[in-house]
Amino acid sequence: MPKESKGKSAVRGESSIDSPSRTGAKPYNKRSAPTTSNGPSSKSQHTSKKPRFEKPNPSGSSSSLPGASKIKASIRQTKRLLAKPNLAPGTKIEAERRLKSLESDLEVASRKQVEKSRASRYHRVKFVERQKLVRRIARCKRNLARLNSDKAAQDLDSEGEASDDDDEGYGNQRLKESKMSKEELTKMLRWLRELLQYVMQYPADLRYVALFPTAEEGPSPPDAKEKDKSRQMAYQHLERVKKAIDDGQISEEVEVELSSKHRTLKKLATSTGGSSNGTTPTTSQAKNKQKMAKKTDKTTKNKRKNEEPISDDDDESDEDAAGAGGVKGDDFFAQDSDDEE
């Protein structure tokens, strides 16, 4: 065995001396890549990593709209085209129709931007107030259960003195609730559930009006005598929530839906017809505007047909442009629209 090992080393030494490229170089410094083998390669090991979670694309035509800056740029281009003199009648009708659809798309995109910014701004406030209301509802239900089980009033007083899961600074409120009657507790439970639905169903395009303005005071919802515009809108939202609970559109026991595993919370329909400024319309209003715009375009088109003869090519281009809605897949400026020369 030792003789064979010496012979191999001698053969290796001879081959390294004979080849000029191997002189003065380390033999294992630059090893060539391994040939194809049956085992798994390093690339396949890297590709077998856990894929990242990708959020699903929201359904709907409004989700495919571009940003507000792109829509504004398209509106400026369309206005420049309409400002040109001696514009062909077919191109002018097409550009006017496109301008109206772009303006409606801009309203939807701007409303989405407002909703996104306000959702991130009021997320923490809504979370804190939701936790406070859930804890108060749980305490009210415990008091009702103890009244139904005919326990002593001393137990209620001791429970009202201190509690680990309640907020700090509400000792007096807990004592009051522990001494309430059954009717008062049921009314309070109903009121707290309405306020919790107020928080959960609050529209994203409105400024949020907090129910707990200070840490020491209890919930103070907006009333009918409010002078501030945002608080008036909040009061209207609270009235809608109360009516929806009475009609059965949303659940009365909202805390049960929140504590469930799947959290299938029923949502109200679009509540407001605009933002706090009252200028941003809903998608249904935008669709109605588009329908009215198409009707007016048809009437103007018929009038111009009687006045000036329009070629068949212009009519076909108008019919193709009627289905275009906004910037998505729009090659309006790609075609040769400068027909005035």
Curated annotation (Swiss-Prot):
GO cellular component: nucleolus
Leader sequence segment: none
Localization terms from the record: Nucleus, Nucleolus
GO biological-process terms attached to the record: maturation of SSU-rRNA from tricistronic rRNA transcript (SSU-rRNA, 5.8S rRNA, LSU-rRNA)
Region called Disordered, residue ranges: 1-115, 151-178, 257-341
Keyword Coiled coil among UniProt keywords: yes
Segments of skewed composition (Basic and acidic residues): 93-115, 294-308
Comp. bias (Low complexity): 58-69, 270-284
Compositionally biased residues, Polar residues: 32-45
Entry's family note: Belongs to the EFG1 family.
Described function: Involved in rRNA processing.
Protein name: rRNA-processing protein EFG1
Gene transcribed to yield this protein: EFG1
